[in-house]
Protein backbone atom coordinates (compact mmCIF):
# COMPACT_ATOMS: atom_id res chain seq x y z
CA UNK A 1 0.00 0.00 0.00
CA UNK A 2 2.91 2.35 0.70
CA UNK A 3 4.25 1.78 -2.80
CA UNK A 4 0.83 2.49 -4.33
CA UNK A 5 0.71 5.77 -2.42
CA UNK A 6 4.27 6.62 -3.49
CA UNK A 7 3.37 6.05 -7.15
CA UNK A 8 0.18 8.09 -6.74
CA UNK A 9 2.02 10.99 -5.11
CA UNK A 10 4.73 10.85 -7.79
CA UNK A 11 2.11 11.15 -10.53
CA UNK A 12 0.30 13.91 -8.63
CA UNK A 13 3.49 15.89 -8.14
CA UNK A 14 4.27 15.52 -11.82
CA UNK A 15 1.03 17.15 -12.98
CA UNK A 16 0.58 19.93 -10.42
CA UNK A 17 2.66 22.78 -9.06
CA UNK A 18 0.04 24.04 -6.63
CA UNK A 19 1.74 24.38 -3.27
CA UNK A 20 -1.58 24.70 -1.49
CA UNK A 21 -2.20 21.01 -2.30
CA UNK A 22 0.55 19.96 0.10
CA UNK A 23 -1.89 19.61 3.00
CA UNK A 24 -4.09 17.27 0.95
CA UNK A 25 -1.09 15.15 -0.05
CA UNK A 26 -0.10 14.88 3.61
CA UNK A 27 -3.58 13.67 4.47
CA UNK A 28 -3.42 11.05 1.72
CA UNK A 29 -0.19 9.75 3.26
CA UNK A 30 -1.92 9.69 6.66
CA UNK A 31 -4.73 7.52 5.31
CA UNK A 32 -2.18 5.18 3.74
CA UNK A 33 -0.32 4.75 7.04
CA UNK A 34 -3.59 4.05 8.89
CA UNK A 35 -4.34 1.31 6.36
CA UNK A 36 -0.84 -0.15 6.89
CA UNK A 37 -1.45 -0.29 10.65
CA UNK A 38 -4.74 -2.15 10.16
CA UNK A 39 -3.15 -4.57 7.67
CA UNK A 40 -0.19 -5.42 9.91
CA UNK A 41 -2.46 -5.80 12.94
CA UNK A 42 -4.51 -8.40 11.08
CA UNK A 43 -1.30 -10.21 10.05
CA UNK A 44 -0.05 -10.67 13.62
CA UNK A 45 -2.22 -13.74 14.20
CA UNK A 46 -0.81 -15.70 11.23
CA UNK A 47 2.91 -14.91 11.44
CA UNK A 48 3.75 -17.28 14.33
CA UNK A 49 7.55 -17.69 14.41
CA UNK A 50 8.19 -15.88 11.16
CA UNK A 51 7.73 -15.96 7.40
CA UNK A 52 10.48 -15.72 4.78
CA UNK A 53 9.81 -13.69 1.64
CA UNK A 54 11.49 -13.33 -1.76
CA UNK A 55 13.87 -16.24 -1.39
CA UNK A 56 15.00 -15.29 2.10
CA UNK A 57 15.75 -11.63 1.41
CA UNK A 58 13.14 -10.65 4.00
CA UNK A 59 12.10 -12.35 7.22
CA UNK A 60 8.90 -11.14 8.88
CA UNK A 61 8.41 -11.93 12.58
CA UNK A 62 6.02 -10.72 15.24
CA UNK A 63 8.68 -8.39 16.63
CA UNK A 64 9.28 -6.74 13.27
CA UNK A 65 5.52 -6.45 12.67
CA UNK A 66 4.96 -4.82 16.06
CA UNK A 67 7.64 -2.25 15.32
CA UNK A 68 6.27 -1.74 11.79
CA UNK A 69 3.03 -0.71 13.47
CA UNK A 70 4.93 1.43 15.96
CA UNK A 71 6.80 3.28 13.20
CA UNK A 72 3.57 3.81 11.25
CA UNK A 73 1.92 5.18 14.40
CA UNK A 74 4.76 7.61 15.17
CA UNK A 75 4.88 8.66 11.51
CA UNK A 76 1.18 9.51 11.65
CA UNK A 77 1.76 11.71 14.69
CA UNK A 78 4.66 13.47 12.94
CA UNK A 79 2.84 13.80 9.63
CA UNK A 80 -0.21 15.37 11.26
CA UNK A 81 2.00 18.35 12.12
CA UNK A 82 1.82 19.29 8.44
CA UNK A 83 -1.60 17.80 7.66
CA UNK A 84 -3.62 20.25 9.76
CA UNK A 85 -3.21 23.96 10.26
CA UNK A 86 -1.53 24.51 13.63
CA UNK A 87 -3.71 27.42 14.72
CA UNK A 88 -7.37 28.26 14.57
CA UNK A 89 -8.97 31.64 15.10
CA UNK A 90 -11.21 32.46 18.04
CA UNK A 91 -14.26 34.44 16.99
CA UNK A 92 -16.74 35.83 19.55
CA UNK A 93 -20.20 34.30 19.59
CA UNK A 94 -23.02 36.05 17.74
CA UNK A 95 -20.50 37.85 15.53
CA UNK A 96 -21.85 39.57 12.48
CA UNK A 97 -20.63 38.71 9.00
CA UNK A 98 -18.70 41.97 9.00
CA UNK A 99 -16.91 41.07 12.25
CA UNK A 100 -16.05 37.59 10.98
CA UNK A 101 -14.54 39.04 7.79
CA UNK A 102 -12.54 41.53 9.84
CA UNK A 103 -11.33 38.72 12.12
CA UNK A 104 -10.16 36.64 9.16
CA UNK A 105 -8.44 39.67 7.67
CA UNK A 106 -6.71 40.31 10.98
CA UNK A 107 -5.38 36.76 11.12
CA UNK A 108 -3.86 37.02 7.67
CA UNK A 109 -2.61 40.56 8.16
CA UNK A 110 -0.76 39.70 11.36
CA UNK A 111 0.39 36.34 9.94
CA UNK A 112 -1.07 34.52 12.92
CA UNK A 113 -3.06 32.04 10.86
CA UNK A 114 -1.06 31.61 7.67
CA UNK A 115 2.51 31.94 8.95
CA UNK A 116 3.29 28.26 8.69
CA UNK A 117 6.84 28.29 7.36
CA UNK A 118 7.66 26.33 4.23
CA UNK A 119 6.56 23.00 5.67
CA UNK A 120 2.94 23.66 4.62
CA UNK A 121 3.94 24.45 1.04
CA UNK A 122 6.22 21.59 -0.08
CA UNK A 123 4.27 19.00 -2.05
CA UNK A 124 7.20 16.52 -2.07
CA UNK A 125 7.28 16.31 1.74
CA UNK A 126 4.88 13.33 2.25
CA UNK A 127 6.42 11.51 -0.71
CA UNK A 128 9.90 11.60 0.82
CA UNK A 129 8.50 10.60 4.21
CA UNK A 130 6.97 7.48 2.67
CA UNK A 131 10.33 6.59 1.11
CA UNK A 132 12.01 6.89 4.53
CA UNK A 133 9.31 4.76 6.16
CA UNK A 134 9.70 2.12 3.43
CA UNK A 135 13.44 1.94 4.06
CA UNK A 136 12.87 1.64 7.82
CA UNK A 137 10.34 -1.17 7.39
CA UNK A 138 12.60 -3.10 5.00
CA UNK A 139 15.62 -2.70 7.29
CA UNK A 140 13.83 -4.26 10.25
CA UNK A 141 12.74 -7.24 8.13
CA UNK A 142 15.84 -7.76 6.01
CA UNK A 143 17.70 -11.07 6.05
CA UNK A 144 20.47 -10.49 3.52
CA UNK A 145 23.55 -8.28 3.40
CA UNK A 146 22.60 -6.78 0.03
CA UNK A 147 19.06 -5.90 1.12
CA UNK A 148 20.48 -4.45 4.36
CA UNK A 149 22.53 -1.92 2.44
CA UNK A 150 19.70 -1.08 0.05
CA UNK A 151 17.29 -0.57 2.95
CA UNK A 152 19.60 1.62 5.02
CA UNK A 153 20.42 3.75 1.98
CA UNK A 154 16.74 4.12 1.06
CA UNK A 155 16.09 5.39 4.57
CA UNK A 156 19.21 7.56 4.71
CA UNK A 157 18.81 9.26 1.32
CA UNK A 158 15.24 10.15 2.19
CA UNK A 159 16.48 11.77 5.40
CA UNK A 160 19.17 13.69 3.48
CA UNK A 161 16.49 15.06 1.16
CA UNK A 162 14.22 15.96 4.06
CA UNK A 163 17.05 17.87 5.73
CA UNK A 164 17.67 20.01 2.64
CA UNK A 165 14.12 20.28 1.31
CA UNK A 166 13.72 23.81 2.72
CA UNK A 167 15.53 25.44 -0.17
CA UNK A 168 15.34 29.02 1.11
CA UNK A 169 17.05 28.15 4.39
CA UNK A 170 20.83 28.45 4.41
CA UNK A 171 21.05 26.68 7.78
CA UNK A 172 18.92 23.78 6.59
CA UNK A 173 21.03 23.33 3.47
CA UNK A 174 24.25 23.38 5.49
CA UNK A 175 22.87 20.89 8.01
CA UNK A 176 21.67 18.58 5.27
CA UNK A 177 25.08 18.71 3.57
CA UNK A 178 26.83 17.77 6.84
CA UNK A 179 24.36 14.94 7.32
CA UNK A 180 24.91 13.69 3.76
CA UNK A 181 28.72 13.74 3.89
CA UNK A 182 29.06 12.09 7.29
CA UNK A 183 26.21 9.70 6.55
CA UNK A 184 28.15 8.64 3.46
CA UNK A 185 31.14 7.93 5.70
CA UNK A 186 29.03 5.63 7.88
CA UNK A 187 27.79 3.85 4.75
CA UNK A 188 31.43 3.18 3.86
CA UNK A 189 31.87 1.31 7.16
CA UNK A 190 28.72 -0.70 6.45
CA UNK A 191 30.01 -1.61 2.99
CA UNK A 192 33.44 -2.52 4.35
CA UNK A 193 31.86 -4.72 7.01
CA UNK A 194 29.60 -6.30 4.38
CA UNK A 195 32.60 -7.17 2.17
CA UNK A 196 34.49 -8.64 5.14
CA UNK A 197 31.48 -10.73 6.12
CA UNK A 198 31.15 -12.05 2.57
CA UNK A 199 34.87 -12.80 2.27
CA UNK A 200 34.91 -14.72 5.55
CA UNK A 201 31.68 -16.61 5.01
CA UNK A 202 31.07 -16.89 1.27
CA UNK A 203 27.40 -15.98 1.67
CA UNK A 204 25.28 -12.85 1.89
CA UNK A 205 22.47 -14.58 3.79
CA UNK A 206 22.22 -13.68 7.46
CA UNK A 207 20.99 -17.21 8.21
CA UNK A 208 24.26 -18.57 6.82
CA UNK A 209 26.23 -16.11 8.92
CA UNK A 210 24.31 -17.14 12.02
CA UNK A 211 25.11 -20.82 11.38
CA UNK A 212 28.82 -20.10 10.87
CA UNK A 213 28.89 -17.98 13.99
CA UNK A 214 27.28 -20.79 16.00
CA UNK A 215 29.84 -23.28 14.70
CA UNK A 216 32.76 -21.00 15.55
CA UNK A 217 31.25 -20.32 18.98
CA UNK A 218 30.94 -24.04 19.73
CA UNK A 219 34.51 -24.52 18.50
CA UNK A 220 35.82 -22.06 21.08
CA UNK A 221 34.29 -24.14 23.84
CA UNK A 222 35.40 -27.46 22.39
CA UNK A 223 39.08 -27.83 23.18
CA UNK A 224 38.87 -31.62 22.83
CA UNK A 225 37.62 -31.41 19.23
CA UNK A 226 40.69 -30.59 17.09
CA UNK A 227 38.87 -31.37 13.84
CA UNK A 228 36.43 -28.59 14.60
CA UNK A 229 39.00 -26.10 15.85
CA UNK A 230 41.34 -26.30 12.90
CA UNK A 231 39.30 -24.85 10.08
CA UNK A 232 37.62 -21.70 11.37
CA UNK A 233 38.42 -18.89 13.79
CA UNK A 234 35.63 -17.02 15.56
CA UNK A 235 37.38 -13.68 15.40
CA UNK A 236 37.00 -13.64 11.59
CA UNK A 237 33.28 -12.97 11.82
CA UNK A 238 33.59 -10.96 15.02
CA UNK A 239 35.99 -8.47 13.47
CA UNK A 240 33.80 -8.16 10.37
CA UNK A 241 30.71 -7.59 12.53
CA UNK A 242 32.66 -5.03 14.56
CA UNK A 243 33.36 -2.94 11.45
CA UNK A 244 29.82 -3.54 10.20
CA UNK A 245 28.25 -2.26 13.43
CA UNK A 246 30.34 0.94 13.49
CA UNK A 247 28.33 2.25 10.53
CA UNK A 248 25.04 1.66 12.34
CA UNK A 249 26.28 3.20 15.58
CA UNK A 250 27.26 6.23 13.51
CA UNK A 251 23.72 6.53 12.15
CA UNK A 252 22.09 6.34 15.61
CA UNK A 253 24.56 9.01 16.86
CA UNK A 254 26.10 6.80 19.53
CA UNK A 255 29.35 8.12 21.00
CA UNK A 256 32.13 8.34 19.91
CA UNK A 257 30.41 8.54 16.49
CA UNK A 258 28.01 11.25 17.60
CA UNK A 259 29.71 14.47 16.49
CA UNK A 260 27.42 15.11 13.52
CA UNK A 261 24.07 15.00 15.34
CA UNK A 262 24.13 18.24 17.43
CA UNK A 263 25.04 20.35 14.39
CA UNK A 264 22.50 18.66 12.14
CA UNK A 265 19.66 18.75 14.70
CA UNK A 266 20.27 22.44 15.33
CA UNK A 267 20.48 23.42 11.66
CA UNK A 268 17.53 21.62 10.10
CA UNK A 269 13.90 22.71 10.74
CA UNK A 270 12.32 21.41 13.91
CA UNK A 271 9.65 19.35 12.15
CA UNK A 272 12.33 17.51 10.15
CA UNK A 273 14.43 17.09 13.31
CA UNK A 274 11.49 15.24 14.85
CA UNK A 275 11.58 12.64 12.09
CA UNK A 276 15.39 12.35 11.97
CA UNK A 277 15.72 11.97 15.75
CA UNK A 278 13.08 9.26 16.17
CA UNK A 279 12.13 7.17 13.13
CA UNK A 280 15.67 6.72 11.80
CA UNK A 281 16.87 5.19 15.07
CA UNK A 282 14.05 2.73 15.76
CA UNK A 283 14.61 0.64 12.63
CA UNK A 284 18.38 0.42 13.20
CA UNK A 285 18.00 -0.62 16.84
CA UNK A 286 15.52 -3.39 15.96
CA UNK A 287 17.90 -4.67 13.27
CA UNK A 288 20.76 -4.63 15.80
CA UNK A 289 18.56 -6.54 18.26
CA UNK A 290 18.18 -9.41 15.78
CA UNK A 291 21.89 -9.28 14.93
CA UNK A 292 23.03 -9.33 18.57
CA UNK A 293 20.66 -12.14 19.49
CA UNK A 294 21.92 -14.46 16.72
CA UNK A 295 25.64 -13.60 16.78
CA UNK A 296 26.47 -13.08 20.45
CA UNK A 297 29.44 -15.36 21.25
CA UNK A 298 28.96 -16.87 24.68
CA UNK A 299 32.04 -19.13 24.57
CA UNK A 300 34.49 -16.90 22.69
CA UNK A 301 37.09 -14.73 24.40
CA UNK A 302 36.23 -11.86 22.06
CA UNK A 303 32.80 -10.74 20.86
CA UNK A 304 31.88 -7.82 18.63
CA UNK A 305 29.17 -6.86 21.13
CA UNK A 306 31.91 -5.47 23.40
CA UNK A 307 31.79 -2.46 21.07
CA UNK A 308 28.21 -1.84 22.21
CA UNK A 309 29.35 -1.71 25.84
CA UNK A 310 32.19 0.71 25.02
CA UNK A 311 29.85 2.89 22.97
CA UNK A 312 27.29 2.81 25.80
CA UNK A 313 29.92 4.05 28.27
CA UNK A 314 31.02 6.91 25.99
CA UNK A 315 27.42 7.85 25.16
CA UNK A 316 26.41 8.08 28.81
CA UNK A 317 29.38 10.26 29.71
CA UNK A 318 29.60 12.50 26.63
CA UNK A 319 25.84 12.99 26.28
CA UNK A 320 25.58 14.10 29.89
CA UNK A 321 28.75 16.16 30.40
CA UNK A 322 28.70 18.05 27.10
CA UNK A 323 24.96 18.62 27.44
CA UNK A 324 25.60 20.73 30.53
CA UNK A 325 27.16 23.49 28.41
CA UNK A 326 24.38 23.78 25.82
CA UNK A 327 22.07 26.78 25.57
CA UNK A 328 20.45 25.96 22.20
CA UNK A 329 17.51 23.68 22.80
CA UNK A 330 17.89 21.32 19.83
CA UNK A 331 21.59 20.82 20.54
CA UNK A 332 20.61 20.04 24.12
CA UNK A 333 18.06 17.48 22.92
CA UNK A 334 20.73 15.98 20.64
CA UNK A 335 23.05 15.36 23.58
CA UNK A 336 20.08 14.13 25.60
CA UNK A 337 19.43 11.60 22.84
CA UNK A 338 23.08 10.50 22.92
CA UNK A 339 22.79 9.87 26.66
CA UNK A 340 19.60 7.84 26.23
CA UNK A 341 21.20 5.88 23.38
CA UNK A 342 23.76 4.82 26.01
CA UNK A 343 20.95 3.28 28.08
CA UNK A 344 19.52 1.55 25.01
CA UNK A 345 22.92 0.08 24.05
CA UNK A 346 23.48 -1.06 27.63
CA UNK A 347 20.24 -3.04 27.48
CA UNK A 348 20.96 -4.27 23.95
CA UNK A 349 24.39 -5.71 24.76
CA UNK A 350 23.06 -7.95 27.55
CA UNK A 351 21.29 -10.41 25.23
CA UNK A 352 19.24 -11.96 28.03
CA UNK A 353 15.50 -12.15 28.49
CA UNK A 354 15.50 -9.35 31.07
CA UNK A 355 17.80 -7.05 29.10
CA UNK A 356 15.87 -7.57 25.86
CA UNK A 357 12.61 -6.76 27.61
CA UNK A 358 14.22 -3.63 29.07
CA UNK A 359 15.56 -2.71 25.61
CA UNK A 360 12.14 -2.96 23.95
CA UNK A 361 10.38 -1.06 26.72
CA UNK A 362 13.00 1.70 26.89
CA UNK A 363 13.02 2.16 23.10
CA UNK A 364 9.22 2.47 22.94
CA UNK A 365 8.81 4.84 25.87
CA UNK A 366 11.73 7.08 24.92
CA UNK A 367 10.55 7.38 21.31
CA UNK A 368 7.10 8.47 22.47
CA UNK A 369 8.46 10.89 25.09
CA UNK A 370 10.97 12.39 22.65
CA UNK A 371 8.20 12.87 20.09
CA UNK A 372 6.11 14.67 22.70
CA UNK A 373 8.94 17.09 23.50
CA UNK A 374 9.43 18.01 19.84
CA UNK A 375 5.70 18.44 19.23
CA UNK A 376 5.44 20.71 22.28
CA UNK A 377 8.41 22.81 21.13
CA UNK A 378 6.85 23.16 17.67
CA UNK A 379 3.51 24.09 19.25
CA UNK A 380 5.13 26.69 21.51
CA UNK A 381 6.70 28.25 18.43
CA UNK A 382 3.31 28.47 16.74
CA UNK A 383 1.66 29.92 19.84
CA UNK A 384 4.18 32.79 20.10
CA UNK A 385 3.56 34.24 16.63
CA UNK A 386 1.20 36.82 18.10
CA UNK A 387 3.81 38.05 20.57
CA UNK A 388 6.88 40.24 20.34
CA UNK A 389 9.99 40.18 22.53
CA UNK A 390 12.17 42.91 23.95
CA UNK A 391 15.28 40.72 23.87
CA UNK A 392 17.45 41.85 20.96
CA UNK A 393 19.34 38.55 20.86
CA UNK A 394 16.27 36.76 19.51
CA UNK A 395 16.11 39.10 16.53
CA UNK A 396 19.51 37.87 15.32
CA UNK A 397 18.42 34.22 15.18
CA UNK A 398 18.42 32.68 11.72
CA UNK A 399 15.65 30.63 10.11
CA UNK A 400 13.04 31.70 12.67
CA UNK A 401 10.14 30.69 10.42
CA UNK A 402 11.13 27.02 10.30
CA UNK A 403 12.61 26.83 13.82
CA UNK A 404 10.84 29.46 15.98
CA UNK A 405 12.24 28.11 19.27
CA UNK A 406 16.03 27.86 19.07
CA UNK A 407 17.48 28.83 22.46
CA UNK A 408 16.36 27.78 25.92
CA UNK A 409 15.91 31.38 27.08
CA UNK A 410 13.04 31.79 24.58
CA UNK A 411 10.99 29.59 26.93
CA UNK A 412 11.49 32.07 29.78
CA UNK A 413 8.22 32.60 31.64
CA UNK A 414 6.16 30.59 29.14
CA UNK A 415 4.12 29.20 32.05
CA UNK A 416 2.41 32.61 32.31
CA UNK A 417 1.46 32.44 28.62
CA UNK A 418 0.22 28.84 28.38
CA UNK A 419 0.22 26.94 31.71
CA UNK A 420 -1.13 23.63 30.38
CA UNK A 421 1.43 23.34 27.60
CA UNK A 422 4.18 24.21 30.08
CA UNK A 423 3.01 21.48 32.45
CA UNK A 424 3.00 18.93 29.61
CA UNK A 425 6.59 19.83 28.74
CA UNK A 426 7.61 19.64 32.41
CA UNK A 427 6.07 16.17 32.84
CA UNK A 428 7.89 14.86 29.77
CA UNK A 429 11.20 16.35 30.90
CA UNK A 430 10.78 14.81 34.37
CA UNK A 431 10.25 11.48 32.60
CA UNK A 432 13.60 11.96 30.82
CA UNK A 433 15.23 12.54 34.21
CA UNK A 434 13.69 9.33 35.57
CA UNK A 435 11.54 10.73 38.36
CA UNK A 436 8.92 8.30 39.71
CA UNK A 437 6.14 7.49 39.02
CA UNK A 438 6.65 8.59 35.41
CA UNK A 439 7.32 6.04 32.69
CA UNK A 440 10.98 7.06 32.29
CA UNK A 441 11.74 5.94 35.85
CA UNK A 442 10.49 2.39 35.23
CA UNK A 443 12.40 2.18 31.94
CA UNK A 444 15.70 3.15 33.57
CA UNK A 445 15.01 0.82 36.47
CA UNK A 446 14.54 -2.12 34.09
CA UNK A 447 17.74 -1.33 32.18
CA UNK A 448 19.84 -0.96 35.33
CA UNK A 449 18.39 -4.12 36.87
CA UNK A 450 19.15 -6.12 33.71
CA UNK A 451 22.68 -4.68 33.57
CA UNK A 452 23.32 -5.77 37.17
CA UNK A 453 22.03 -9.26 36.39
CA UNK A 454 24.54 -9.45 33.52
CA UNK A 455 27.41 -8.34 35.76
CA UNK A 456 27.88 -4.82 34.35
CA UNK A 457 28.35 -3.21 37.76
CA UNK A 458 30.68 -0.43 36.61
CA UNK A 459 28.40 0.60 33.73
CA UNK A 460 25.42 0.56 36.08
CA UNK A 461 27.15 2.98 38.44
CA UNK A 462 28.10 5.24 35.52
CA UNK A 463 24.49 5.19 34.28
CA UNK A 464 23.17 6.19 37.71
CA UNK A 465 25.69 9.02 38.06
CA UNK A 466 25.04 10.38 34.57
CA UNK A 467 21.28 10.29 35.19
CA UNK A 468 21.74 12.44 38.29
CA UNK A 469 24.12 14.85 36.54
CA UNK A 470 21.90 15.05 33.46
CA UNK A 471 19.03 16.25 35.62
CA UNK A 472 20.86 19.59 35.87
CA UNK A 473 20.30 20.66 32.26
CA UNK A 474 16.76 19.30 32.26
CA UNK A 475 15.90 21.28 35.39
CA UNK A 476 17.43 24.38 33.81
CA UNK A 477 14.63 24.25 31.23
CA UNK A 478 12.05 23.90 34.02
CA UNK A 479 13.58 26.88 35.82
CA UNK A 480 13.35 29.07 32.71
CA UNK A 481 9.71 28.17 32.12
CA UNK A 482 8.31 28.45 35.64
CA UNK A 483 10.55 30.77 37.66
CA UNK A 484 11.13 33.70 35.30
CA UNK A 485 8.84 36.38 33.99
CA UNK A 486 8.22 36.20 30.24
CA UNK A 487 10.19 38.28 27.74
CA UNK A 488 7.23 38.17 25.35
CA UNK A 489 4.39 40.65 25.23
CA UNK A 490 1.32 41.03 23.05
CA UNK A 491 2.04 42.64 19.72
CA UNK A 492 0.60 46.17 20.22
CA UNK A 493 -0.37 46.49 16.57
CA UNK A 494 -2.75 43.56 16.99
CA UNK A 495 -4.46 45.10 20.01
CA UNK A 496 -4.84 48.47 18.28
CA UNK A 497 -6.24 46.85 15.16
CA UNK A 498 -8.74 44.83 17.17
CA UNK A 499 -9.79 47.90 19.13
CA UNK A 500 -10.35 49.98 16.01
CA UNK A 501 -12.44 47.30 14.35
CA UNK A 502 -14.55 46.67 17.44
CA UNK A 503 -13.67 42.99 17.62
CA UNK A 504 -12.90 43.20 21.33
CA UNK A 505 -13.90 45.62 24.03
CA UNK A 506 -10.53 47.11 24.91
CA UNK A 507 -7.14 47.36 23.31
CA UNK A 508 -4.51 44.90 24.44
CA UNK A 509 -7.05 42.17 25.20
CA UNK A 510 -5.46 39.85 22.66
CA UNK A 511 -4.55 36.60 24.42
CA UNK A 512 -3.96 32.97 23.58
CA UNK A 513 -7.71 32.41 23.26
CA UNK A 514 -7.78 34.50 20.10
CA UNK A 515 -5.60 31.95 18.28
CA UNK A 516 -6.00 28.52 19.80
CA UNK A 517 -3.77 25.52 19.16
CA UNK A 518 -5.62 23.27 16.71
CA UNK A 519 -7.35 20.14 17.96
CA UNK A 520 -4.94 17.52 16.48
CA UNK A 521 -2.00 19.18 18.23
CA UNK A 522 -3.85 19.50 21.53
CA UNK A 523 -5.19 15.94 21.50
CA UNK A 524 -1.79 14.43 20.62
CA UNK A 525 0.06 16.30 23.37
CA UNK A 526 -2.66 15.56 25.93
CA UNK A 527 -2.79 11.81 25.28
CA UNK A 528 1.00 11.31 25.26
CA UNK A 529 1.40 13.37 28.43
CA UNK A 530 -1.31 11.36 30.20
CA UNK A 531 0.35 8.09 29.13
CA UNK A 532 3.66 9.30 30.59
CA UNK A 533 2.01 10.52 33.78
CA UNK A 534 -0.42 7.65 34.40
CA UNK A 535 1.79 4.75 33.34
CA UNK A 536 1.82 3.39 36.88
CA UNK A 537 -1.91 2.62 36.54
CA UNK A 538 -1.59 0.74 33.22
CA UNK A 539 1.88 -0.78 33.39
CA UNK A 540 0.63 -4.36 32.99
CA UNK A 541 -0.36 -3.81 29.36
CA UNK A 542 3.01 -2.31 28.36
CA UNK A 543 5.10 -4.85 30.24
CA UNK A 544 3.00 -7.78 29.03
CA UNK A 545 3.55 -6.74 25.42
CA UNK A 546 7.32 -6.59 25.99
CA UNK A 547 7.31 -9.98 27.70
CA UNK A 548 5.40 -11.59 24.83
CA UNK A 549 7.79 -10.15 22.24
CA UNK A 550 10.82 -11.41 24.17
CA UNK A 551 9.30 -14.87 24.51
CA UNK A 552 8.67 -14.97 20.77
CA UNK A 553 12.28 -13.95 20.08
CA UNK A 554 13.87 -16.46 22.46
CA UNK A 555 11.56 -19.31 21.43
CA UNK A 556 12.72 -19.20 17.80
Swiss-Prot record:
Q: What is its EC number?
A: 7.1.1.2
Provide this UniProt record's keywords sorted from A to Z: Electron transport, Membrane, Mitochondrion, Mitochondrion inner membrane, NAD, Respiratory chain, Translocase, Transmembrane, Transmembrane helix, Transport, Ubiquinone
A Pfam family name for this chain? Answer: Proton_antipo_M
Annotated transmembrane regions: 58-78, 122-142, 145-165, 177-197, 239-259, 268-288, 304-324, 333-353, 358-378, 423-443, 455-475, 517-537
Q: How does it sit in the membrane?
A: Multi-pass membrane protein
Using the UniProt record, give the first listed, main subcellular location.
mitochondrion
The record's subcellular locations are: Mitochondrion inner membrane
Question: What is the enzyme's class at the highest EC level?
Answer: translocase
Give GO terms: molecular function aspect only: NADH dehydrogenase (ubiquinone) activity
Which reaction is this enzyme known to catalyze?
a ubiquinone + NADH + 5 H(+)(in) = a ubiquinol + NAD(+) + 4 H(+)(out)
Q: Name one GO cellular component term.
A: mitochondrial inner membrane
Q: Which family does it belong to?
A: Belongs to the complex I subunit 2 family.
Write out the function statement from the record.
Answer: Core subunit of the mitochondrial membrane respiratory chain NADH dehydrogenase (Complex I) that is believed to belong to the minimal assembly required for catalysis. Complex I functions in the transfer of electrons from NADH to the respiratory chain. The immediate electron acceptor for the enzyme is believed to be ubiquinone.
Protein name stated in the entry:
NADH-ubiquinone oxidoreductase chain 2
Source species, please?
Podospora anserina (strain S / ATCC MYA-4624 / DSM 980 / FGSC 10383) (Pleurage anserina)
Q: Which gene encodes it?
A: ND2
Amino acid sequence: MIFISIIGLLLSNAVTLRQDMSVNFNRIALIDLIYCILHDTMSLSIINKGIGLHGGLLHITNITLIFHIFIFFLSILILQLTSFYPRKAWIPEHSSLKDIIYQKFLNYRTKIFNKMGEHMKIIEYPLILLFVISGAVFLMSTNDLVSIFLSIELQSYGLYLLSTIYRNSELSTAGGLIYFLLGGLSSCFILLGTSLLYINSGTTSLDGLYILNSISDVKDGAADMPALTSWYKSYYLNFALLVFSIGFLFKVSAAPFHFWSPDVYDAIPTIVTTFVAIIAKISIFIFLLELVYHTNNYLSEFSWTYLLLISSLFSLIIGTVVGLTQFRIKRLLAYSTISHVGFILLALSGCSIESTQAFIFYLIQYSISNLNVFIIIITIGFSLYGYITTNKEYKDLLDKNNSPIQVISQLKGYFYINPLLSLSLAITIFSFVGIPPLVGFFAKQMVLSAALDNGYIFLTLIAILTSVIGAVYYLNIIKKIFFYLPDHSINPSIGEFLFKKGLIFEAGDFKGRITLISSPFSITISIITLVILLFIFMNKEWLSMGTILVQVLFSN
